[in-house]
């Protein structure tokens, strides 16, 4: 039997699901370095897929425990943008179906922008309901960032198309009669909170990129409103905008000068 070309071997390996496949056994016996590299790559890919699968099911334990008690609509809630000097705080509430599965799902801060965007689209398709809450810098200055974050989370829940029976929240307690569980570092421990963190992060990043187009000298599309050297220098040169949080240092100090 004629040997496959390296390219053919690469394409065949994409189709092979397990080592028992006759084609895989054939490639295992192929001594060409190029083929052996592809086989090794296949093993590493399968190992990664298995780890992602295990991690996903570990992150589903809160949801599974609630479903065993008959709870169907579970909303994961997370926020993005508590620390920046500019822009809103954005929260998301996401209700996922029982058969939801996106391997590699994690805290949005640990994912590349490309992966966040891809997961964002997949979550939008698969989710039962998504609600977003956005609180402006002006309100943040009026009621403080902690209260503004709570308000944004309550808004996100109110904007859901269904009423959740239980809330899984990343390190917060909300003044609502809906039963809730607060989970420290929940965006890495719950698939619902992780999905919410991705929706919130992509939503806010897109808003900050729009601000970057409106005020190109500030570079919002690069630092997303955080207090980087570039951002602070831009404020010194061009001044404080309406989009800046006047109650946050060093903006507060700059205004008082």
Swiss-Prot record:
Residues 72-257 form the RNase H type-2 domain. A divalent metal cation binds at residues 78-79, 170. One of its GO terms (cellular component) is ribonuclease H2 complex. Its EC number is 3.1.26.4. One of its GO terms (biological process) is mismatch repair. The keyword Nuclease applies. Keywords: Cytoplasm, Endonuclease, Hydrolase, Manganese, Metal-binding, Nuclease. It is an enzyme of class 3 (hydrolase). Its cofactor is Mn(2+); Mg(2+). Pfam families: RNase_HII. GO terms for molecular function: manganese ion binding; RNA binding; RNA-DNA hybrid ribonuclease activity. It catalyses: Endonucleolytic cleavage to 5'-phosphomonoester. PROSITE patterns: RNASE_H_2. InterPro entries: RNase_HII (IPR022898), RNase_HII/HIII (IPR001352), RNase_HII/HIII_dom (IPR024567), RNaseH-like_sf (IPR012337), RNaseH_sf (IPR036397). Manganese or magnesium. Binds 1 divalent metal ion per monomer in the absence of substrate. May bind a second metal ion after substrate binding. It comes from the Bacteria. It is found in: Cytoplasm. NCBIfam families: PRK00015.1-1, PRK00015.1-3. Belongs to the RNase HII family. Endonuclease that specifically degrades the RNA of RNA-DNA hybrids. This is Ribonuclease HII. It comes from Bacillus cereus (strain G9842).
């Amino acid at each position: 039997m004629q040997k496959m070309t390296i390219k053919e071997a690469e394409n065949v390996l994409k189709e092979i699901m397990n080592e028992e496949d006759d084609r895989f056994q054939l490639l295992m016996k192929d001594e060409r370095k190029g083929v052996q590299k592809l086989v090794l790559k296949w093993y590493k890919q399968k190992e990664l897929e298995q780890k992602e699968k295990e991690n996903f099911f570990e992150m589903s334990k809160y949801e599974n425990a609630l479903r065993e008690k008959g709870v169907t609509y579970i909303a994961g809630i997370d926020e993005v943008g508590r620390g920046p000097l500019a822009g809103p705080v954005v929260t998301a509430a996401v209700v996922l179906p029982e058969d939801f599965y996106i391997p590699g799902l994690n805290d949005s801060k640990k994912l590349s922008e490309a992966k966040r965007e891809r997961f964002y689209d997949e979550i939008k398709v698969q989710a039962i309901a998504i609600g977003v809450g956005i609180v402006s810098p002006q309100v943040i200055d009026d009621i403080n960032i902690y209260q503004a974050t709570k308000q944004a989370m309550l808004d996100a829940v109110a904007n859901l198309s269904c009423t959740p029976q239980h809330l899984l929240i990343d390190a917060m307690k909300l003044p609502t009669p809906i039963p809730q569980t607060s989970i420290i570092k929940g965006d890495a421990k719950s698939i619902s909170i992780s999905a919410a963190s991705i929706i919130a992060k992509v939503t806010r990043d897109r808003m900050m990129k729009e601000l970057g187009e409106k005020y190109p000298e500030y570079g919002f599309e690069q630092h997303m409103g955080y207090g980087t050297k570039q951002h602070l220098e831009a404020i010194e040169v061009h001044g404080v905008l309406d989009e800046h949080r006047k109650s946050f240092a060093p903006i507060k100090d700059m205004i008082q000068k």
